[in-house]
Amino acid sequence: MADKKDFAFKILSDNRQAGHNYFLSERFECGMVLTGTEVKAAKDAKIQLKDAYASVLGDEAWLLNAHISQYSHGNRENHLPVRNRKLLLHRREIDKLQEITREKGLALIPTKIYMKNGKIKCEIAVAKGKKLYDKRAADKARTADDEARAEMRRRA
């Protein structure tokens, strides 16, 4: 039997551009409704979240534009790479997300997809788009930190 640590935590896909393009605030963990070949492809880390976003449509939360490549050993029953996937959340969380997305300028962005105890989970974050000058300021601060860190290493 497999050890418990084998199922602990494994990141399958990470949306690195989300932190660069958005101010991320509150985060939610949710399950996903996937087909069998999607699960197998996801476990092979064949997921792209670059243009993906989440939305509350009706009484359900959905992950839109996420790309899960077709499973390499799949047959004619293989899944479509880009389709809407239902997110599994508690009712109060869905209601909260619906209130949040009504505010102008806020969106729901998937930040990562990971395995937790053998189940595939998606982390979505409430996001507000950054302007170009915000991105420049963040880059400037990052380079200043890097230079200071390099200078400290040289002196030590």
Curated annotation (Swiss-Prot):
Q: Which organism is it from?
A: Solibacter usitatus (strain Ellin6076)
* Principal cellular location given in the protein's record: cytoplasm
Q: What is this protein called?
A: SsrA-binding protein
In which family does this protein belong, per the annotation? Answer: Belongs to the SmpB family.
Q: What does this protein do?
A: Required for rescue of stalled ribosomes mediated by trans-translation. Binds to transfer-messenger RNA (tmRNA), required for stable association of tmRNA with ribosomes. tmRNA and SmpB together mimic tRNA shape, replacing the anticodon stem-loop with SmpB. tmRNA is encoded by the ssrA gene; the 2 termini fold to resemble tRNA(Ala) and it encodes a 'tag peptide', a short internal open reading frame. During trans-translation Ala-aminoacylated tmRNA acts like a tRNA, entering the A-site of stalled ribosomes, displacing the stalled mRNA.
- Please give the residue ranges the record annotates as the region Disordered: 135-156
Q: Kindly state which keywords UniProt assigns to this record, in alphabetical order.
A: Cytoplasm, RNA-binding
Give one GO molecular function term. Answer: RNA binding
Designated gene of the protein: smpB
Entry's localization field: Cytoplasm
- Its Gene Ontology biological processes? trans-translation
Q: Which InterPro entries does this UniProt record tie to the protein? A: SmpB, SsrA-bd_prot, SsrA-bd_prot_CS
Q: Which domain of life is it from?
A: Bacteria
Its Gene Ontology cellular component terms are: cytosol
Q: Name one Pfam family in it.
A: SmpB
Q: Does the keyword RNA-binding apply?
A: yes
Q: Mind telling me which PANTHER family this protein's record contains?
A: SSRA-BINDING PROTEIN (PTHR30308:SF2), TMRNA-BINDING COMPONENT OF TRANS-TRANSLATION TAGGING COMPLEX (PTHR30308)
HAMAP family assigned to the protein according to its UniProt record, in alphabetical order: SmpB (MF_00023)
